[in-house]
Amino acid sequence: MVSLLKKLIGSRNDRLLKEYRKQVAQINSLEPKISALSDEELSAKTQEFRDRHQQGTSLDDLLPEAFAVVREAGKRVFGMRHFDVQMLGGIALHNGKIAEMRTGEGKTLMATLPVYLNAIAGKGVHVVTVNDYLARRDAEWMGRLYRFLGMSTGVVVPQQPNDEKIAAYAADITYGTNNEFGFDYLRDNMEYRVEDRRQRRLFYAIVDEVDSILIDEARTPLIISGQAEDHTELYVRMNAVPPLLKRMASEPKPHEPEPEGDYWVDEKSQQVYMSEAGHESAEKILTRVGLLPEGESLYDPRHIALMHHMMVALRAHTLFFRDQQYVVQDDEVVIVDEFTGRLMVGRRWSDGLHQAVEAKEGVKIQHENQTLASITFQNYFRMYDKLSGMTGTADTEAYEFQEIYTLETVIIPTNKPMVRKDQNDQVFKTTQEKYQAILNDIRDCHERGQPVLVGTTSIENSELLAGLLRQAKLPHEVLNAKQHAREAEIVAEAGKPGHITIATNMAGRGTDIVLGGSVDKQVDLIHANEALSEAEKEARIETLRAEWKPLNERVKQAGGLRIIGTERHESRRIDNQLRGRAGRQGDPGSSRFYLSLEDPLMRIFAGDRVRAIMERLKLPEGEPIEAGMVTRSIETAQRKVEGRNFDIRKQLLEYDDVANDQRKVLYSQRNEVLEAASIGATVEGLRDAAVAEMFRGFIPEESVEEQWDVAGLEKALAGDWHIQLPLTDMLEQEPNLTDEELLERVVAAARQIYTAKVEQVGAESWAQFERSIMLQSIDTHWREHLSALDYLRQGIHLRGYAQKNPKQEYKREAFELFSGMLDRIRDDVVRVLMTVRVQSAEQVEQAEADAAQPHVQNVQYHHSDYDEALADDGQPQGAQPVRNVLPKVGRNEPCPCGSGKKYKHCHGQLA
């Protein structure tokens, strides 16, 4: 029935493309008119569009003419005309959708269309790439087109001077990585001067390789951290414990005796669990090595930290392995990105895990980090007014894009028909048999002159295969994190006849593999040679292109690029990315995955079923099974993993939304403090509230005089705020004085002391001092609050055992923590401002200058293990509504946190 309806009215994708094609026809009809314009007239169109937009013409109405202008500029600047399918993709991106375009279809050029159109609004467009190389390359390459049309471009990269960053963000179009955009947002919310902030309001972003950034990286929060307490000695001593504990042969089963051993490893959840016997063994070992006093338990409150350090050491020994999850380089443990195979220099696992791995490897242990600010990519990118993305593989994750980001996926047709042959998987019993078959396939391709790209899942596997190829005397290139610097060069040459390239996962995304090899690199070198005249350069380039044509033809005759996968990935999408490197722009190509029952995916999720099939068929050694049923079984396993990972990301988002709402409130109020001409009225309100709260602690409302602790109040006022008031004498002289009148006198005394300080140093200098003290207090307490939320999240799943909903408990307790933090900020600010002793304006200015200094050193970007918060958390919950922008909340409206209080009595206390 559904298929019949689709035939009659078309799928949603078909209907969208039909609508877009009408606009493409409109754009094409403008081509003769736009082509007739001179370069100056074409460039002047930008200002004309801006004027029309300011006068009320919408960007949607400007689209046909603006796209026609960009197409013409592309012809004049690059000698490249946007295809109609690129126009379709550009329209999808402008409409805030994800455009799925196959590899080699020209996504970079396509993006110029919506980028130019949205830059007309003058609010800044961000183009987000996966690495700094692509950001710089695309900014320089596409920047030529934008400059031709009178628009400015900027690029943001790590370690860039602040003034350059500010200029880059002020440009019409800004290129950068997802990490750098996110970090700059966090840095902006840690600045002490308005002029040091970098970003404008987040208006429109186009995310390149959107699946990699919004799906693969979704569980990786950006964290700015600073050094915390030193536990180096503890990590070294704890590292000796895991080898003394015995691993169980299997996981304990309910209602069965526990297998012999101290702990078991759950590879699916990446966790280690202790048995009852294991706890006893651990206590004996820790007592023996002097970490636990004789007769005391690991579960005593003062030894809980020991338990944490031991579990971290166990995870480091059983779940994290050299040349798989990390490499050791220059006496440092460097994380390897599980999705791209790249080294993630500067990133560190948090919660003590990185230090435990360093202790295991015997390298220098670096200090633990305290979180200063953090945000997930999910929440950062949802802050843009409009978001869109492009990739070659989004369709398998279309549901998640819609559910989490409310982004619809539009599949853009290819410019030329796809002719790549995707062959069935071959499954072998052992890894050795699998690699022998891969070697035979590579040798056959090499002898026939067919280029081969071999995809591996880890650096370890890529180097194992490279060793086998060396033994077989087959020349090859290895592209993994260790050869990152040569990435573009290796990928550019990967299409030459008989070339063999081994790549981890999707290293090299963003650079096309051209059949016959890429001539662009050599053309660039010729252009850079100043010793040659223009005529000589043209002649050499012509010769180069002539030599390339027979190479291109030879590779096509050999079957195009051959893709070999050495393992299936957990996600079908990453398999499709590997396959997508072949068959670009209608080129021939083929692909096949070789698997063994010893591969992690097969072992954990599909091994038993496929092994049973192989045993029934009684296949001889070295003989693979190749059948649609096996491939379907593997895809079912992948769907299970994808579904589980989606549930984890969705649950993480539900937890992080709590912190995100608090972050928005706090950052909004911090920005108000930073931008306000004076915060005197805010400070006065905080001071009066703090005085009243202290007063009511000693003299409760509606209480009789016998219940008043006047002496205690006098002492507290003098000790905490240096307010010397003879309250006892006042009451003796005026017996009829009410508590309200007494409160007014205390408030008036506080105000008088404060006014004297202001007059002593001058209103202007004092206003700046107030601002710096307020900002310092907000930052300090926010850091502590983030640590408190981390601890709360790690143990919250245990509430499930008490028949409570962990998410609801987390929301409730996080709100209580946030309310407590606001109270502490208020008390802290009032105490400092009331008790500070200043002699001159110069002292105040010096204090302000000290506060404005960079107060975060060694900014690091590292993983945080959020899986613990999700453990045992039951079924996935329904999706929460997605809000792109937090609306401005009126002071008397209900607080958006859901407490039921008015905003002014809740999170608006600092506003």
Curated annotation (Swiss-Prot):
UniProt GO cellular component terms: cell envelope Sec protein transport complex; cytosol; plasma membrane
Cofactor(s) needed for function: Zn(2+)
Role summary: Part of the Sec protein translocase complex. Interacts with the SecYEG preprotein conducting channel. Has a central role in coupling the hydrolysis of ATP to the transfer of proteins into and across the cell membrane, serving both as a receptor for the preprotein-SecB complex and as an ATP-driven molecular motor driving the stepwise translocation of polypeptide chains across the membrane.
GO annotation, biological process: intracellular protein transmembrane transport; protein import; protein targeting; protein transport by the Sec complex
Ligand binding (Zn(2+)): 895, 897, 906-907
PANTHER family: CHLOROPLAST PROTEIN-TRANSPORTING ATPASE, SECA INNER MEMBRANE COMPONENT OF SEC PROTEIN SECRETION SYSTEM
Annotated catalysed reactions: ATP + H2O + cellular proteinSide 1 = ADP + phosphate + cellular proteinSide 2
Subunit (UniProt): Monomer and homodimer. Part of the essential Sec protein translocation apparatus which comprises SecA, SecYEG and auxiliary proteins SecDF-YajC and YidC.
Catalytic activity, EC: 7.4.2.8
Family designation: Belongs to the SecA family.
Keyword set, alphabetical order: ATP-binding, Cell inner membrane, Cell membrane, Cytoplasm, Membrane, Metal-binding, Nucleotide-binding, Protein transport, Translocase, Translocation, Transport, Zinc
Annotated protein name in UniProt: Protein translocase subunit SecA
Compartment annotation: Cell inner membrane; Cytoplasm
Entry keyword Protein transport: yes
Predominant cellular place of this UniProt entry's protein: membrane
Residues given in the record as ATP binding sites: 86, 104-108, 512
Cofactor stoichiometry and binding remark: May bind 1 zinc ion per subunit.
Membrane topology of the entry: Peripheral membrane protein
Keyword Transferase recorded: no
SUPFAM superfamilies assigned to the protein according to its UniProt record, in alphabetical order: Helical scaffold and wing domains of SecA (SSF81886), P-loop containing nucleoside triphosphate hydrolases (SSF52540), Pre-protein crosslinking domain of SecA (SSF81767)
Gene: secA
A Pfam family of this chain: SEC-C
UniProt cross-references to CDD domains, sorted A to Z: DEXDc_SecA (cd17928), SF2_C_secA (cd18803)
GO molecular function, one term: protein-exporting ATPase activity
UniProt cross-references to InterPro entries, sorted A to Z: Helicase_ATP-bd, Helicase_C-like, P-loop_NTPase, SEC_C_motif, SecA, SecA_CS, SecA_DEAD, SecA_motor_DEAD
